[in-house]
């Protein structure tokens, strides 16, 4: 009986997602699953010398800040 109970507990732990992982958009396209310590998605707008706009997207452990950067903390929020 103890073996059966232990087996059920182990299977429950294995099948459950015990940690939440954030998903963000990344460059050039697609998505990425952030590392455990990366709790924010960011989108940074960079103006090139030819006045083209470049969007840098990804995961971060903190918001880089600045007027050209937007940060958020929910899945796929940095579109």
UniProtKB/Swiss-Prot annotation:
CDD domains: TFP_snake_toxin (cd00206)
Keyword terms: Disulfide bond, Secreted, Signal, Toxin
Major subcellular location class: secreted
Gene Ontology cellular component list: extracellular region
An example molecular function term from Gene Ontology annotations: toxin activity
Subcellular localization, as worded in the UniProt entry: Secreted
SUPFAM superfamilies for the chain: Snake toxin-like (SSF57302)
InterPro entries: Snake_3FTx, Snake_toxin-like_sf
The organism's place on the tree of life at top rank: Eukaryota
S-S bonds: 24-41, 34-59, 63-71, 72-77
Signal sequence residues: 1-23
Tissue expr: Expressed by the venom gland.
Family, per entry: Belongs to the three-finger toxin family. Short-chain subfamily.
Protein name: Toxin 3FTx-Oxy5
């Amino acid at each position: 009986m103890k073996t059966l109970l232990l087996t059920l507990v182990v299977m429950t732990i294995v099948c459950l997602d015990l940690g939440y992982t954030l998903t963000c958009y990344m460059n050039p396209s697609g998505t990425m699953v952030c590392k455990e310590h990366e709790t924010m998605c960011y989108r940074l707008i960079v103006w090139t010398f030819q006045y083209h706009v470049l969007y840098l997207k990804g995961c971060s452990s903190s918001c880089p800040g600045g007027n050209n950067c937007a940060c958020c903390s929910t899945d796929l929020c940095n579109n």
